Amino acid sequence: TSVVVTTGGGSSAPFNVTLASVAPTITLALGSTSEGLFYTLKNVQVTPTSLANPGDTLSLYATGLGDTTPAAPVSGVATSTLPLSPLPTVTVGGQSATVLFAGIPSGFASLYQINFVVPKNVQGNVPVVVSIGGQSSNSVTLPLFGISAVVNGASFLNTGTAAPEELISIFANGLGNKDQDFDFPSTTVQGVSVTINGIPAPVTALAASGSQINLVTPSNLPTTGTVQVQLTTPSGTSVDFPLIMNAAVPGIFLVADPSNPTAQIAVAQFANTVWLAMPTSTAVALQIPQNCTASNANPLSICGQPAAPGDTLVLYATGLGEVTPNGDPNGTPLGTGVVAPANASTLYETTATTTVTVGGIAAKVLFAGVAPGTSGEYQVDFQVPTGVTEGDAVPLKVSLPGSSTAAATLAVHSR
């Protein structure tokens, strides 16, 4: 079928379209490219600041759902409610929702309303899809109270797994609007708390404006199986969010490069300095001094340069698993919310063997454990091996038995 638009005495060129009995499309919220237009039974629009809850009955609006009974008028608005039969299906977060009504309401023209019940086991920002006649609609986002994702606090990878004593970030709706940068080891900040298998988790930061809360997983969690994460805020308590536990889920902290947003540069300092190992271009983009060694820079002043074979670096990570004094497998693990001694009077090292590879070549690991004065933040001291193929983005990986990091990068150049 061809469509021609005529206006002001002129006509457009024909535009070919394919007609189908159904072509479901969910209406988007005004100004959004992803959020659907949803309303509660009280005709309140659902938005990121006015959330719906699991179990709520909501309405969405869509086009292209096909014939009603009786049929809709060819032109003008419906003068009575025109129901659809059979009903479309609605999935919310991959779960089937109960559809209570679908049709064109009285006073509407070609715009369908679907009333449905949000499944009780979904939460956070979830996708919604309408299907009818073998066709599925666009996927839109429904903002619900609760947790959207739990990610590694260093790499921000969403693997659905975590380890005891790991820094994690939870992205969730309903955290309020007040940020609090650091209140460790408090387990409640601005009325927001998280439990994992019923154990309160120490909070490191609440970024409510970014829908994010950072915390350290309790050290006495199991290292296998699934645990349940539950969020409590002044608005209520979320449904359980499942999280698979492993002995280690390592993740490397990364440097943000303004000149290369996709870069995966590891946070690694030169030993006994605050200099950072990075490409010269990254140091320039960050507007920090370069050529630290050649310029004899102050070791306590920020500076950036590539590492060289033989250099000793301090890499920062999380999720390396159980730590005890000197890595003694029979020692007492660092407790939940306990900070490793800042004066390094006792070094809490990983009980599992930690390995580092640079460009696929094994590096000599000098220390792997919780950084003194921290909890959940690990440091790995290692020497850059010789024989590495040099470059600005040499693959760097940390591994423990049964797990390893996604490959970060390290700039390596001889000097």
Q: Could you tell me what each predicted segment is?
A:
Residues 1-415:
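A sequence-level detector for low-complexity, Ser/Thr- and acidic-rich stretches
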